[in-house]
Curated annotation (Swiss-Prot):
It comes from Tupiella akineta (Green alga). Its EC number is 2.7.7.6. The N-terminal domain is essential for RNAP assembly and basal transcription, whereas the C-terminal domain is involved in interaction with transcriptional regulators and with upstream promoter elements. Residues 510-577 are annotated as: Alpha C-terminal domain (alpha-CTD). The gene is rpoA. The keyword Iron-sulfur does not apply. This is DNA-directed RNA polymerase subunit alpha. One of its GO terms (biological process) is DNA-templated transcription.
């Protein structure tokens, strides 16, 4: 029996000790909960990318006290839709069109359709842009123009590189410049707007700055057939086509009429064409056409041999025709005149070969347009693009750009009970973006915009003569006093020499502004402020006309309120009557 009692007492002690330990730990937790502040957490519930221009995110924000969740959710929603900056195309210059309903030759879409497609392009940048930027587009067909063909600054890029712009045929050519700006919400143009004329002059002055000396296909599509017009700056002005000892010299006086300035001669041969593939610029420094020939490529050599055979047949036909009629030429015609005709025919055959010589193979080879001769047009490099400046129309088309990166925002308020059985609210926030920003980053930026909006309200002082009780602002009081003194001297005194000469007039003019201030600028507490207002004391001038006894006679205005009013007046160097 003794052993059983000991075991029971021992078990009772162990249970009691365990209970006390739990109680102490619960007290510690409760104390910690009282000391520790409550945190608002943002967690992602769901997110998905529907396509490159549609991001979706679902977030939980909270906990909040009852009533606070609705305030935060509504403020966040409005901030997301109106305060976030975006980048977009705002103004376009198009060569070859004067109005938006015109259609350029070789372009499937009208100018209006192209502008609408440019409006839908979503741009983003590595940082916020504070000044307008310029972009370029200069392409010729056949091919499809997409967002990746736009020549943009290095820090700006398209969210969806495959976004459609236009389609060009064989004879199609599209040249344009456009202005890129950063803003909020959206923009609508007014013809008399000064900002529109500033952007228009900026767009007219801008010129493309291209350092590359080789042709470029579309960046995003290897199989694209669009080449960009790139001006080349070479040191060598000599005109050499293919170099070899066995060459046939072709005089090209008629090429001068076409705008092709050949400085020396045009040389053509077989061996260097197939073996060395040594190709230099066919045109001089001021008028060059950007296309290259690449060596050691099997597919390219196959197309080269086919081209060479066709070209050789044309040459043999010309030779036979020349030898057959040589005697007739010498007898019946002037030799110089006959020579010009043959040269014209030769240059014409070279410049406008058969269509099959221009056929591009459907291959993944990025150099599939090598060895294909291109017709050179007269180039006016005083203009921004490779078009004849005199015969080309220029149109300027503003775009009602949409800068908002947020497409849609929804929120839902849910109430839950925490561990202490207290009701807490949480916000379920749904955000859809256009792909230029992640939904979570958008919420952070929207919250930051709200903080920057409300932060000045903590520091605002309608009366700069007052000194705040907060120690954080005491250091800036000396600067405030200096500003006030400078304001007295510069704004009031130097403006009128008569005021500066008369000190009484000086003081009277400056103090008059202070006396007209409302007593709310004294930052009194609620009790003295309400008593003074009920006594019809509205301005500081009314207040200093009272004595201490008069103020103490006001109902509910005691000694403590009097001391508070006197301290507030001392800060403004004023006293009661």
């Amino acid at each position: 029996m003794i052993k059983i009692i000991i075991k029971e007492t021992f078990s009772f002690k162990s249970v009691l000790m365990h209970f006390l330990k739990e109680k102490v730990s619960n007290n510690k937790i409760s104390k910690k909960n009282k000391i520790m502040p409550s945190y608002t957490l943002l967690s992602c519930i769901d997110s998905r990318v529907e396509n490159l221009t549609k991001f979706y995110g679902r977030f939980e924000l909270g906990p909040f006290a009852p009533g606070q969740a609705l305030t935060v959710a509504n403020a966040l929603r409005r901030s997301l839709l109106s305060q976030l900056p975006g980048t977009s195309i705002t103004l376009v210059e198009v060569r070859g069109a004067s109005n938006e309903y015109e259609i350029i030759t070789g372009v499937r879409e009208s100018i209006l359709d192209i502008l609408l497609n440019l409006k839908q392009i979503v741009l983003t940048s590595d940082f916020e842009i504070f000044s307008p930027q310029i972009g370029f587009l200069s392409v010729e067909g056949p091919g499809v123009i997409r967002a990746n063909d736009l020549k943009l600054p290095s820090f700006i890029y398209a969210v969806d590189p495959n976004q459609y712009i236009a389609t060009l045929s064989n004879s199609g050519r599209l040249n344009m410049k456009f202005l890129i700006c950063c803003g909020k919400n959206y923009i609508t143009y007014n013809p008399n707007d000064s900002q529109y004329f500033e952007w228009l002059s900026l767009l007219k002055k801008s010129k493309p700055l291209i350092k590359s000396n080789s042709p470029k296909l579309n960046k995003g599509n290897i199989n694209s057939e669009i080449d960009s017009d790139i001006s080349i700056d070479k040191k060598n002005d000599e005109v050499i086509f293919f170099q070899n000892a066995n060459t046939r010299v072709v005089d090209s006086q008629t090429a001068l009429k076409k705008g092709l300035v050949l400085k020396n001669t045009l040389r053509i041969n077989k061996s260097s064409f197939l073996i060395n593939s040594n190709y230099q610029s066919f045109f001089p420094k001021t008028q060059q056409k950007a296309f290259s020939i690449f060596r050691k490529n099997s597919k390219t050599f196959l197309s080269t041999m086919g081209f060479y055979k066709e070209w050789k047949k044309e040459r043999e036909f010309l030779k036979k025709d020349l030898y057959k009629n040589q005697e007739d030429f010498n007898k019946s015609y002037d030799f110089q005149e006959t020579k010009k005709k043959l040269q014209t025919k030769l240059i014409k055959n070279f410049e406008t070969p058969k269509k099959k010589l221009f056929k591009v193979q459907n291959s993944a080879n990025p150099f599939n347009k090598a060895f294909i001769p291109l017709t050179e047009e007269k180039v006016d490099y005083d203009s921004d693009f490779n078009l004849d400046h005199k015969s080309t129309k220029i149109g300027y088309f503003p775009i009602d750009a949409i800068f908002m990166p947020i497409n849609r925002v929804n929120y839902l308020i849910e109430s839950t009970e925490d561990i202490k059985l207290k009701i807490k609210d949480r916000v379920i926030l749904e955000v859809w973006t256009n792909g230029s920003i992640h939904p979570r980053h958008a919420i952070h930026k929207a919250a930051k915009a709200l903080i920057q909006l409300f932060l000045p309200l903590q520091q605002i002082r309608t009366n700069l003569f007052l000194i705040s009780d907060n120690s954080h602002f005491e250091e800036g009081q000396d600067k405030i006093k200096k500003r006030i003194d400078n304001f007295k001297k510069e704004a009031l005194l130097k403006a009128n020499p008569q005021i500066q000469a008369n000190p009484q007039l000086k003081k009277r003019n400056f103090d008059h502004r202070l006396l007209e201030l409302d007593i709310a600028n004294l930052e009194l507490t609620a009790r003295p402020y309400s008593c003074l207002k009920l006594a019809n004391i509205n301005t500081i001038e009314d207040l200093i006309s009272y004595s201490q006894e008069d103020l103490l006679s006001i109902k509910n205005f005691g000694r403590r309120s009097l001391i508070e009013v006197q301290k507030a007046l001392q800060l403004m160097k004023l006293t009661l009557k």
